Swiss-Prot record:
Protein name, entry field: Large ribosomal subunit protein bL17
SUPFAM superfamilies, A to Z: Prokaryotic ribosomal protein L17
UniProt record similarity statement: Belongs to the bacterial ribosomal protein bL17 family.
Keyword Repeat in annotation: no
A GO cellular-component term linked to this record: cytosolic large ribosomal subunit
Pfam families: Ribosomal_L17
Keywords noted in UniProt: Ribonucleoprotein, Ribosomal protein
GO biological process: translation
GO molecular function: structural constituent of ribosome
Keyword Nucleus: no
Assembly notes: Part of the 50S ribosomal subunit. Contacts protein L32.
């Protein structure tokens, strides 16, 4: 029985899942918008949102935890210097998942995952 077992297997081994979500989280924080399948997007929330919550309190221990989970110095810097400050007053819900149709080929449901308060291209141009 699978009672009280949370999370999706996504037809991968545990090490493959861990590596995949680590890479997806790094891509999300780097680009602030990624396109993936809907089940992966929903599971990515469970990895990425705690990292942003961790970044709201800047300490050496938290930076080391974030580096352990992302393995990227640049992303740790962005998390603590930019994203942690951006979401300091928000109590969670840092990601938005938007369904965007089905993939050609296997008809898999696709979704965009984006950071909630990200600067869009139009806002960046109008700010200048």
């Amino acid at each position: 029985m699978r009672h009280r077992k949370s999370g999706r297997h996504l037809s991968r081994t545990s090490s493959h899942r861990k590596a995949m979500f680590q890479n997806m989280a790094v891509s999300l924080f780097e680009h602030e918008l990624i396109k993936t399948t809907l089940p992966k997007a929903k599971e990515l929330r469970r990895v990425a949102e705690p990292l942003i919550t961790l970044a709201k309190t800047d300490s050496l221990a938290n930076r080391r935890l974030a580096f352990d989970r992302t393995r990227s110095k640049a992303i740790v810097g962005k998390l603590f210097n930019d994203l942690g400050k951006r979401y300091a007053t928000r109590e969670g819900g840092y990601l938005r998942i938007l369904k965007c149709g089905f993939r050609a080929g296997d008809n898999a449901p696709m979704a965009y995952v984006e950071l909630v308060d990200r600067a869009t291209a139009g806002e960046a141009v109008s700010a200048e």
